[in-house]
Amino acid sequence: PYRRQRQMCIRDSSKGMSIEAEVGSIGGVEDGVVGNGEIADPAECAKITDLGIDFLAAGIGNIHGVYPANWKGLDFEALDRIHKATNNIPLVLHGGTGIPDDMIAKAISLGVSKININTECQLVFAEATRKYIEEGKDQQGKGFDPRKLLAPGAKAIEAKCKEKIELFGCAGKG
């Protein structure tokens, strides 16, 4: 049933492209799709891995966007089963924003090698840009120039990424 996808993986990887697949429903709200943070089936993950993908993102209770107060956390037993079922393919954690540092560290120890934190970057960008405007800096000189107006947000994203690089243990790695 995955013949077409397999052909795409072969074609794309032959052109030097990395292929990441998402299995199961990653919860949260993204592009109008709402999910609750389901747990992916390790057998399905193994089938998808056999297509020739390079990275696998699987639902382990994670969600896109901001986590609600009643979030139950990541399912590390499921993560371990998925990692073993997929022959140690590099795993991706979608919805990394707001996951406690200790959970991130444990996920990395169980095979996660890429963590998406887009929402976190968007939030710090918005906060820094809002502060710039609320302080009236957009009204001073040419503070309305988009390069000046957006600079605090860009710097906030840079600072957040540096913080996460340290947390994820990536500093100094190629």
Model-derived features: positions:
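Extended, intrinsically disordered, low-complexity segments
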Residues: I133-G174
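Active-site glycine- and acidic-residue-rich loops that bind
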Residues: R4, G27-A43
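Active-site beta-loop-alpha junctions enriched in small/polar residues
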Residues: E22-G32, G59-I63, H94-G98, N118-Q122
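Structural preference for beta-strand elements that scaffold enzyme active sites
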Residues: G16-E20, D54-A57, P90-V92, K114-N116
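Glycine-rich phosphate-binding active-site loops on the catalytic face of alpha/beta enzymes
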Residues: R4, I60-G65, L110-A126
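Glycine/Thr-rich beta-alpha phosphate-binding loop at enzyme active sites
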Residues: L51-E77
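Catalytic cores of alpha/beta
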Residues: G96-L110
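Single conserved hydrophobic/aromatic residue that forms the stacking wall/gate
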Residues: P1-I10
